[in-house]
Amino acid sequence: MVLSNVVRVVNRLNSAGTRSGLMGIRQLRRKYTYRSGALKPMPNVIPFGLLGVVLTVIPGLLIGATISKNMANFLEENDLFVPSDDDDDDD
């Protein structure tokens, strides 16, 4: 009921825009309903989606931190980049 009201309002705005010469809205994309007004079926929901994201992001962060730490140690051991103590103004 509410969705059909929204579709009607958009159609009115679309027709009003074309009458005044505005071609901003060319096509109405219906995400939730078919042209007949029937509701589309619910999309497939992946179970444990948030858990999958967490199980993907956390190992990626840990691996990235390990690689960064190893690279920093390598650069410091080979004297390619040694942080100077003059930059520390924590007195």
Curated annotation (Swiss-Prot):
InterPro entries referenced in this protein's UniProt entry, alphabetically: MCU_reg (IPR018782)
Chief site of localization: mitochondrion
Membrane topology: Single-pass membrane protein
Coiled coil, from the record: none
One cellular-component annotation, GO: uniplex complex
Gene Ontology terms describing biological process: calcium import into the mitochondrion; mitochondrial calcium ion homeostasis
Family named by the database record: Belongs to the SMDT1/EMRE family.
Protein name: Essential MCU regulator, mitochondrial
